[in-house]
Each structure stands twice: as C-alpha cells, then as structure tokens.
Amino acid sequence: MVLLACLTCFISVTGLTGCSSSGDIGNGTVTASASAAPTAPVLDSNLPVDALPVIPAGKSEMVPCPYLDTQWVANTNGQRMIGQGVDARFNTPACVFWSFPDEPQATVIVRHMPTEQAAINVVDWAAPITTTEPVDENGWSGGRSGNPQGAVYAVQKGPVAVVVFSNQEQSLKVELIAKETIKNLNL
C-alpha cells in the first residue's frame, strides 16, 4: 500500500523526484508528500539563440543600462540619446539605446549559455562567418561587419556571448561598445 501511494504520487506529479509516505497503515490512511529536485539555474530564461531584447515602451522608456554609461554610448556611437531600456529576461539585462530614428541606435546583448557551442550559435546567428570579418582577440572570437544598414560585433568566450548592433555603419563603434561591456562586467 505504501509503495502504491508513492508510485501514484510520482506518476501524478510530473517533475518531482521523491515521495515519502506517512500515516497509519493499519487504518488504511496513507498520505504522500513530494519534494522537488534541486534545479539548475535557467540561463537567459531559456530564450532562443536569436532572441532580441523587448522594450515595451520603446524609445519613450528611460531605464539606464546597468553596465554602460549613457553618455559614453551616445559619444561612442555618435548620436544623441533620447531613450533607453533594458530587457531583464536575459541574465545580464540586454540594453537598447535610441536616438531620433525609430530603430535603436545601439543594442547590447550578453548571453550566458549552457554550453560553449550554444554561445557560438548566438555569434553565428548575429554575425555569420560567411558575411562578416573574423574577430579573435584576448580569447574572444566571432565576427564583425559594417555597412549602410548598420554594424554588428559578436564574440564569444566559453559559454558567454556578447552581441552589439548599431544603426551606424562603422564596425569600430560596436567593437568599442562590446569591449566596454566586457570590461565593465569583468567577462
């Protein structure tokens, strides 16, 4: 009877790893309790490799990036800052900066992936090797590109990926923003 109660508990409560029984078997009452297994941290809320930040209020929001100075980003990207926001779904909040155009002037995404290969997949999505110039510096590798549609700099080291997009065509600007992010977060 105790075995049946424990088996029933296990089957009916998916995802729980243990059951114990207590009660008076003599009178036929059995109670079962379950304990949850310790869970590993969920990295970046299990977001897909190609996840982009979502800022509901758009450029009318004014939430500062916790690891990049607003004026520094404006000076580095060469545009006045009129809005900024963060997406806390990412372990390190993704930061989005706006100037006058509707599209962001800069987007910074730091991904903490479960494996090095997953981080490489993030970089390959943002800066595909077939369309970007390779980057390999201080253990960070990836790609960079700049053209009239904008620039990208995406690198990874171990299971961490850093991706920066800009509406400016110079890839030096996104490189500087990525390096400042890496420095400020001690990555």
Would you name each region that the model predicts?
Residues G85-R89, E116-Y153, L187:
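Short Gly/Thr-rich strand-loop-strand
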Residues S20-T92, V174-L187:
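N-terminal "mature-domain start" segment
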Residues M1-C6:
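Bacterial N-terminal signal peptides that target proteins for export
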Residues C9-S12, S22, L68, W98:
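General secretory precursor processing signal
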Residues G15-G18:
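C-terminal motif of bacterial Sec signal peptides marking the signal peptidase cleavage site
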Residues A94-I120, A161-F165:
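A short acidic-to-branched-hydrophobic micro-motif
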